[in-house]
Amino acid sequence: MERTDRWGRIYRRRQAEYVTSFPSLLDYFGFVYHFPGLLGGPNTYYREYHDVMNNIRYPSGKLPATRWRAVLLNLAKGCFFLALFVVGSLYLPADFLLTASFADRSLARRVLRLYLTFLAVRCRYFGLWKLGESLCILDGFGEETKDGVSQWTGISNIDIWAFETSSSMSAATRAWNKRTQKWLQMCIYERSNFNQFYVFMVSAFWHGFYPSYYLCFGLGSLLQYANRLTAIKLWPRVKGTWMETPYLVLGNVCVMLVGSYMLEAMFNYSFERAWLGWKQASFFGVVFLFCGIVLLWFIPKASREGKDKRD
């Protein structure tokens, strides 16, 4: 019954994306080389692209005027974050993290510099995604209706606030590159029963063949595992108590710092440069995760009785 319900949910989610007729070469290449999609990744699925371009979604051929607010807002966000990226690249160059001068600093200063450097790097993605989102909305893609209100959030690739304030790896993953995440979920993850490590390795393979990608996503699977342990063993103890907010804040700090350590590997591409970058940071991300996981193994699960009382 559980398996039947699972496939039923998967089937219903996919219905909206079904392609009812085989696309012509013109339609296919028009979708593949659609400029807003090239700029920010394929933000929309072929079904939506086809329906908008052929006046099926908007039979009159006139696009809703309500989209202009979302177009201008995302355009402003895109320009703002790209400006932050340019400034950050000047004052926080990533290559400095590989130098002896960086390694000579205290661990606290190195960790802070690492975080700020890759915060600036993330701004590049924030900016490009928001520009691509703005152009897609201008073309009529991404309209959703929630509670009877039209919203232009259907092609959003990033929830910046949710990502930067996430207190777990799973929350950060859901907020980052959302359209690709949805595609991978529909086409791969929901069709398999493999573990979390497999999921992260598929993501690494999707990005490319640089060895550093597999270091990055391998560490990401460990961070996800650590988050699952804390959710099972710690979260029931603090939920609904005065410790809930400190727990979430500490979780956010851990995810952002270890996440920045992961990104250092990803953006160094070769194994040698990635390993050097981790070494210059004293392998703090790896040591922190392994020590945290071992410690969590020895913490007993919260009693069901105590959890029920708090709930």
Feature-to-residue mapping (PLM):
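Non-catalytic, membrane-anchoring transmembrane segments at the edges
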Residues: 1-311
